Amino acid sequence: YPTAKIFFFTRWNCKNFKGSDSEKVVDAMIEVCGNYSIPIFDCARKGSIYADNDTFRRIYFQKSKNNTDTAHLNSKGHDRFLKVAESFLLQY
């Protein structure tokens, strides 16, 4: 697919994100994608998905033991993020 485009999306934020290894990974992804001119969306800071919030996770994330899943959106979560992701993708 020589004309296909590639995009990256970072992980969501998490509890104690600021200064964490998770933040370092997000920043590294942004830096590497920038070096190769690959569009990347910073979901941790701009995604409007609040994985660090217990109430938010109960509503927008898949059910998990002790409500600890911070990665997998449910259908409501996907509906919420769709507008944000679509807006990013349509820039390209």
List each language-model region with its residue ranges:
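Catalytic His-Asp segment of secreted/periplasmic serine-dependent ester chemistry enzymes
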Residues: 13-92
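A short helix->loop->beta-strand "cap" motif at the edges of active sites that frequently abuts
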Residues: 1-6
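A cross-domain feature marking catalytic cores of carbohydrate-active enzymes
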Residues: 8-11
